[in-house]
Amino acid sequence: MHVVLLDSTAVRFDDLCTALQALEFPSDGERDHPELRAVLAARSSIQDAVLDDDFLASCLHLELQLLERDELRPGLVPFFTMPGLGIRFAFGYWPPGGSPGPHEHTAWTITAVCRNELEVLTYDREESYSRRELVLKNRFPASAGKVGYIYEPCIHAPINNSSRWSLSFHMTSPRDGEDPGDVCGDPLPGLLERARPDRTNSDHVYRKVIERRRQVRRIRAIGNMLPSLNSTKASSLSDKCTALGGFMTDRPESGKPTRHGFALERVHKDLELSYRLDAGMAVLYSETPTGSLKELALDSLGREAIAFVSKERSFTIEDMPGDLSTEERLHIADALEETGLYVKIGDDYACTSD
């Protein structure tokens, strides 16, 4: 086996792919799994790579291209798949308290924490299947830069116990998710299905809301992490985030948005919204396949704006009625886009600041 050692001071994504091509990974479509030494060598390369912000910038550039194509679905969605090997690369996004719950990997994977931290719970797979209940085995803290791997089928549950978003980098086998064939019977209670259904797979217009919400939250998670990225590419990545819908991530040190005027349009022309008063709050509701859903609530100051939004399919922030400052209008518009109900359209324009 020929192992390529990467210079940890100058790791780029294409360098990593070149190194992986030199390892003894089976070709895509082959039934064989790689030898453990190949996975460990790949883990070593990942360990060097995630410490290099230019490497992360290269990967985030590919991730933003994926987000721009709007091809998201639940779980890890690869931003790149290696030709010939089928090895998949993806980012994991972890809001405060976020966890997918206990789930099973059935082939090798390598995971690195890029920003902030995670805690990883592992379960005794053999005992869990034998007793038909999840049996906790270990609990590992994983701070930024920590890299772990799975070689044999494993049950684990990462969780972000912090108050900030975390970002993880995943390199996975093309065979991860296949049934290893070593257990039979009903699914293990408490374990996520290997092939989770996409709950947005519906003809209802609310599907577009879910898709857009997922997209914009990931864009903003990236945008809010970019100030800590020591790379010349950080500025262009920030511009891309802003253009894709992360306009409130573009802030000077004062904490106020640097951009003012823009227009919003409902994410789907047939999406129905309504407005009600509830305990002194102005509440915006959407119509979903299961009925009305509360999306956004503002105090009495935003009552006129919410009533207006419930009726209008497109508008500029200055169109919103009420005694609102520019900053307040921006925050309402920001919240509307983060819900996935509205998308920004057209170019920015100058408007009067407070």
Predicted regions span which residues?
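Short acidic, hydrophobic short linear motifs in intrinsically disordered regions
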Residues: E304-L324
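Conserved short histidine dyad/triad with adjacent acidic residue
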Residues: A90-E104, P141-A142, Y151-P153
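Short beta-strand His + acidic residue motifs that chelate non-heme Fe in jelly-roll/DSBH
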Residues: P100-H103, V120-L121, I155-S162
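A short glycine-rich, His/Asp/Glu-containing loop-to-beta-strand
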Residues: Q65-P96, A144, L284
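A short hydrophobic beta-strand segment most commonly corresponding to one strand
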Residues: I110-C114, S163-P180
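Acidic, low-complexity/disordered tracts enriched in E/D and polar residues
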Residues: N230-V309, D334, Y349-D354
